[in-house]
A protein has these predicted regions:
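Exposed, interaction-prone extracellular/peripheral surfaces
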Residues: 1-38, 51-56, 65, 70, ...
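A positional/architectural concept
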Residues: 39-43
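Acidic, metal-associated active-site segment
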Residues: 48
Length: 296
């Protein structure tokens, strides 16, 4: 059973609190301009303090607090337009592959992104999906919501469903419409029309991020000789002799598939990143997501 704390310690969570999800679509009104965090808004509703870090706007330093405590603090204000972040977690059976499993890494990443969003006063919704959206946790707000959000993620990781159909992300429109950020976590190992699924999220006002999660054994299979391979989602099997030539053809096919996703996302204005299950989620992955324009 997946630990609903995902093994994160307080030092790592403190690092996450210095990040925000990057919304590439400018907000309208007083919060207009590229958004780093909705609590850096221009409304007059006071929200909280936090410690000053290099690069913060000196105009929001609370000098009274500095005079009392000899430390720099920023006054934070609740933005007038709160961003809704929906994390779509693929919990199909193909995500059970790998050591650690792809589903476990996707769950930890969902926990990381949800924590960052909730810390920044965003609203977070969780959509579990396989053949379609089979579980939906409506928008949760504030850090008090972290345990509930993480429990939902852990339950999805522990309860796989038979198939992946990215095209059925179009059913999200039944749950909500309007501006927001949609983060799709999947291996994208599907014959379904993933293009129409991602486009459908854009059509209902979402700024879309797609993160493909693959196991090293999928990228470079350590197989030779005679095997019976079974499709994780359809249970269809095939007996094959795995030769260097066949492995070469497989790698070429996977590269074409990943290239198609990458180029599609670039054309559609969708942020895209590929992560391996052996990634250091407590370290380099945060830098990778910043480089991909997903975190700021």
């Amino acid at each position: 059973m997946t630990d609903a704390t995902f093994g994160f310690d307080s030092a790592f969570l403190h690092r996450l609190e210095r990040l925000s999800l990057l919304n590439r679509r400018p907000l309208q009104g007083p919060s207009a301009g590229p958004r780093r965090s909705p609590r850096h808004g221009a409304s007059v509703e006071f929200a909280d303090f936090r410690t000053y870090v290099t690069g913060d706007d000196f105009r929001r330093v609370d000098w009274n607090a500095y005079a009392r405590l000899d430390r720099l603090f920023l006054r934070l204000y609740r933005a007038e337009e709160i961003t809704v972040v929906t994390i779509f977690l693929d919990h199909s059976t193909s995500m059970q592959f790998g050591d650690p499993k792809k589903s476990f890494i996707a769950g930890k990443l969902a926990a990381i992104l949800s924590y960052i969003a909730l810390h920044n006063y965003d609203t977070v919704a969780i959509a579990g999906w396989g053949d379609g959206i089979d579980r939906f946790l409506p928008g949760q707000s504030g850090k008090k919501a972290v345990p509930r959000v993480w429990r939902t993620i852990a339950q999805l990781v522990d309860n796989p469903v038979p198939a992946t159909n990215v095209a059925n992300l179009k059913t999200y429109g039944k749950y909500r419409r309007g501006p927001g950020i949609a983060v799709v976590l999947s291996d994208f190992m599907t014959d379904s029309d993933w293009r129409s699924g991602l486009r459908s999220l854009r059509a209902v006002g979402q700024e879309v991020t797609a993160i493909q999660i693959l196991a090293p054994e999928e990228i470079d299979p350590p197989l030779r000789g005679d095997w019976k391979l079974v499709d994780a989602e359809t249970s269809a099997g095939a007996e094959v002799t795995i030769s260097p030539r066949l492995l070469h053809r497989y790698r070429e096919a996977l590269e074409r598939h990943t290239k198609a996703i990458t180029e599609f996302c670039r054309r559609e204005g969708i942020a895209f990143a590929q992560l391996r299950t052996d990634v250091d989620l407590n370290g380099t992955v945060l830098s990778d997501l910043r480089a991909a324009g997903i975190l700021a």
